Amino acid sequence: MLAAGRRVACAVSGGVDSAVAALLLRRRGYQVTGVFMKNWDPLDEQGACSVDRDCEDAYRVCQKLDIPFHQVSYVKEYWNEVFSDLLKEYELGRTPNPDIVCNKHIKFNHFLHYAMDNLGADAIATGHYARTSLEDEEVFQQKHTKRPRELFRNRFEVRNTVKLLQGADLFKDQTFFLSQISQDALRKTIFPLGDLTKSFVRKIASEHGLHHVLKKKEACTTFPFQSMGVCFIGERNFEKFLLEYLEPQPGNFVSIEDKKVMGTHKGWFLYTIGQRARLAGLQGAWFVVDKDVSTGDIFVAPSTDHPALFRDLLRTNRVHWIAEEPPAELVRDKMMECHFRFRHQMALVPCVLTLNQDGSVWVTLVKPARALTPGQFAVFYKGDECLGSGKILRLGPSVFTMQQGRNREEGTKKEDIDKVEPAT
């Protein structure tokens, strides 16, 4: 059997998905090594999240499967390449997505090279619900380049692009979180769960006695306004956690409709667009629709579907394309139709991309989307292929702003008509 000599380093987190991924690889005959990545030091703060408990669960999985277990620390790398970036983004008034950044820098860079260079692995594997255009055996035929890489890849080297494809379980599909990983990493990665549903994965775990991981929650915690799965926050209040690292920046809640001050807040970085703003003494729900970092004002509106929450235009930074280059259609025509999302599990939205000279894109949506948020990633799709992503840096005017402009324009026209002297 070809698989017998193939060595695979499988990331194990102590959860059910990575456990079943390792199990399936073992059943296929690969020489599997489980690797637990420690990305956060609980001694750094007064946290409630137990990294040690996750490590113990991962170790028990490897014992159960009779595979070697390794633990590697990326605490320093995570701080420098993920968490520091997260803090800077919040200071700029944006809402970052550390999961995407972590996958790019830690799991599919540092872990990949550790597995290849230190463990002698031929490939890595994770428990993500995603697929690639390579068959598993083709992964082992891909060349691995040891670090440091050459500054420029040999342009005469002929390589067929490996595609990142959505998982069979579209509800659990995690290509969104993989949209910034490199082509080189994708070539050396196996996703054993790509063709499976979550319910079937849990069934496999149960049938093979992995009961301790079945009892665990999906993630240690999530942010209050969207699922990010930042495990090191634990059961703590997100506001208190962030204020451990950022100085309070008090400001006002301001009504987007009449610019009236509605209350005060401790810092614009504690709120994201679309989040409910709890305003003392006011009836009804108010929602964050915009932020002005220069003044510290957070603009709010009195309903969850207020037109100030909806926009149909955004601009990204330089897009990371999974194929390393923009799609040929986009290069040729400078425009391309595709689909996009900026939150995991949100419905894909038809859009048109316009390519800029700096590699960024304007994204024009066929209909306005709610709570487009600077700092989040716009992830692009063609069919079941994830093309890549770019960080949202700028937003077009909201539907509310456009309505106000039209109202002013119509009012001006009416005034002009009134000024015209009647014909005699």
Curated annotation (Swiss-Prot):
Lineage: Eukaryota, Metazoa, Chordata, Craniata, Vertebrata
Active site: 102, 231
Short name of any one Pfam family annotated for the protein: tRNA_Me_trans_C
GO cellular component: mitochondrion
GO terms, biological process: tRNA wobble position uridine thiolation
Domain of life of the source: Eukaryota
Location of the protein in the cell: Mitochondrion
Major site of localization recorded for this protein: mitochondrion
Ranges annotated as biased composition (Basic and acidic residues): 406-424
Catalytic activities: 5-taurinomethyluridine(34) in tRNA + S-sulfanyl-L-cysteinyl-[protein] + AH2 + ATP = 5-taurinomethyl-2-thiouridine(34) in tRNA + L-cysteinyl-[protein] + A + AMP + diphosphate + H(+)
Function: Catalyzes the 2-thiolation of uridine at the wobble position (U34) of mitochondrial tRNA(Lys), tRNA(Glu) and tRNA(Gln). Required for the formation of 5-taurinomethyl-2-thiouridine (tm5s2U) of mitochondrial tRNA(Lys), tRNA(Glu), and tRNA(Gln) at the wobble position. ATP is required to activate the C2 atom of the wobble base.
Residues at which ATP binds: 11-18, 37, 127
Covalent S-S links between cysteines: 102-231
Interaction with target base in tRNA, as annotated region: 97-99
Keywords for the protein's UniProt record, in alphabetical order: ATP-binding, Disulfide bond, Mitochondrion, Nucleotide-binding, RNA-binding, Transferase, tRNA processing, tRNA-binding
Family assignment from sequence similarity: Belongs to the MnmA/TRMU family.
Stretch list, region Interaction with tRNA: 172-174, 343-344
Protein name, as recorded: Mitochondrial tRNA-specific 2-thiouridylase 1
Residue numbers marked as site, Interaction with tRNA: 128, 276, 376
A GO molecular-function descriptor: tRNA binding
EC nos: 2.8.1.14
